[in-house]
Curated annotation (Swiss-Prot):
Compositional bias segments (type: Low complexity): 272-285
Chain positions found as Phosphoserine: 264, 279
Family, per entry: Belongs to the cyclin family. Cyclin D subfamily.
GO BP terms, alphabetized: cell division; G1/S transition of mitotic cell cycle; positive regulation of G1/S transition of mitotic cell cycle
High-level lineage: Eukaryota, Metazoa, Chordata, Craniata, Vertebrata
Listed transmembrane segments: none
The protein, known as: G1/S-specific cyclin-D3
Domain Cyclin N-terminal span(s) in chain numbering: 27-152
Sorted UniProt keywords: Cell cycle, Cell division, Cyclin, Cytoplasm, Nucleus, Phosphoprotein, Transcription, Transcription regulation, Ubl conjugation
InterPro entries, A to Z: Cyclin, Cyclin-like_dom, Cyclin-like_sf, Cyclin_C-dom, Cyclin_N, Cyclins_cyclin-box
Record text on subunit structure and interactions: Interacts with the CDK4 and CDK6 protein kinases to form a serine/threonine kinase holoenzyme complex. The cyclin subunit imparts substrate specificity to the complex. Interacts with ATF5. Interacts with EIF3K. Component of the ternary complex cyclin D/CDK4/CDKN1B required for nuclear translocation and modulation of CDK4-mediated kinase activity. Can form similar complexes with either CDKN1A or CDKN2A.
Xref: SUPFAM superfamilies: Cyclin-like (SSF47954)
């Protein structure tokens, strides 16, 4: 008797888009009401932190993004981890020697909330080159949870993407590409502290606007598209236009830096970890693939 194994590569089951939820205005309004709760009120570099500087946050953000890319995390994991990081730093003075430990803990918590198979403590320790111990990660996990008051279900810009795209009359064959480009813009914004105090809905609409105009995916003019997006998100047209211009400027700066420096080596991968196929949902495409 022969046994036939029909199991393929393990894929997480995913629910399809629900048009009734996406089209229900109450869902969007609920997110808009909640988003301000999770946005830092002021620059913690001026009010709270003494050792940590903006460039340190940026270096940490790039490392966290590389780890999420290497582990093919869901698109929401990295921005959510950065949200935890900013909220923690906005209320707790932290030494720069503890910054990587804090970033690893934030990724651990975000993956537990948004990932089907969350990151493990052992893998995160390897990515820190064992500068962080499992005991430290567990202790700091409890510490960060307490400082965040266990409120981890933060509203982030990714939560608005599907709702906004559903309300735009985009060709069906361009929707997926626009979404992927917008996700890359969101990841770029998460690495830049300039956007930390922007409402997630504004970052989402600005990213979609930049993606649509860059791809030429909509027949409407830029001003008409901005007015439409501002009406969907309930924000001022001028504020949204300024946000979109800032996102495009951040992209140009990132491309300029990428052209001047050689690609950084990938973070150390845990032994025995297997790479997953390109069909697996992963963090957004590289920023160099974006065209304005």
């Amino acid at each position: 008797m022969e046994l036939l194994c029909c199991e393929g590569t393990r894929h997480a089951p995913r629910a399809g888009p629900d048009p009734r939820l996406l089209g229900d205005q109450r869902v969007l309004q609920s997110l808009l009401r909640l988003e301000e709760r999770y946005v830092p009120r002021a620059s913690y570099f001026q009010c709270v932190q003494r050792e940590i500087k903006p460039h340190m946050r940026k270096m940490l953000a790039y490392w966290m993004l590389e780890v999420c890319e290497e582990q093919r995390c869901e698109e929401e994991v990295f921005p959510l981890a950065m949200n935890y990081l900013d909220r923690y730093l906005s209320c707790v003075p932290t030494r720069k020697a503890q910054l990587q430990l804090l970033g690893a803990v934030c990724m651990l918590l975000a993956s537990k909330l948004r990932e089907t198979t969350p990151l493990t403590i052992e893998k995160l320790c390897i990515y820190t080159d064992h500068s962080v111990s499992p005991r430290q990660l567990r202790d700091w996990e409890v510490l960060v949870l307490g400082k965040l008051k266990w409120d981890l279900a933060a509203v982030i810009a990714h939560d608005f993407l599907a709702l906004i795209l559903h309300r735009l009359s985009l060709p069906r064959d361009r929707q997926a590409l626009v979404k992927k480009h917008a996700q890359t813009f969101l990841a770029l914004c998460a690495t830049d502290y300039t956007f930390a105090m922007y409402p997630p809905s504004m970052i989402a609409t600005g990213s979609i606007g930049a993606a649509v105009q860059g791809l030429g995916a909509c027949s409407t003019s830029g001003d008409e598209l901005t007015e439409l997006l501002a009406g969907i998100a309930g924000t001022e047209v001028d504020c949204l236009r300024a946000c979109q211009e800032q996102i495009e400027a951040a992209l140009r700066e990132s491309l300029r830096e990428a052209a001047q420096t050689s690609p950084s080596p990938a973070p150390k991968a845990p032994r025995g970890s297997s790479s997953q196929g390109p069909s697996q949902t992963s963090t957004p495409t590289d920023v160099t693939a974006i065209h304005l």
